[in-house]
Amino acid sequence: MNTKEPHKRVVQGKVISKFAEKSAVILVERKVVHKKYRKIVKKFKKYTIHDQDNQVKVGDFVSAIECKPLSKTKSFTLKEILVVGV
């Protein structure tokens, strides 16, 4: 049989806060076209990610992958650090 892996979202963003052990907040930016004015607008969203080894620092650009909920707000884990100290 052919088993499929569940599709998991991958987000990339900048670490803006390292508030607790094994946790960090990343800011993800996306660009959308405004419905009425047809102008490209930046939209931002914050995600709390799980950092098992405490390796990220504020200013790093990281990639995070969706996982099962780890707490009330954490449902992403650190995948890799793309750029150190942006």
From Swiss-Prot:
Swiss-Prot/TrEMBL GO biological process terms: translation
Presence of the UniProt keyword Membrane in the record: no
Listed InterPro entries: NA-bd_OB-fold, Ribosomal_uS17, Ribosomal_uS17_bact/chlr, Ribosomal_uS17_CS
Keywords, in A-Z order: Ribonucleoprotein, Ribosomal protein, RNA-binding, rRNA-binding
SUPFAM superfamilies tied to this protein: Nucleic acid-binding proteins (SSF50249)
GO molecular function ontology, one term from the record: structural constituent of ribosome
Family per similarity comment: Belongs to the universal ribosomal protein uS17 family.
Subunit structure: Part of the 30S ribosomal subunit.
Function: One of the primary rRNA binding proteins, it binds specifically to the 5'-end of 16S ribosomal RNA.
Name the record gives this protein: Small ribosomal subunit protein uS17
Organism this protein belongs to: Helicobacter acinonychis (strain Sheeba)
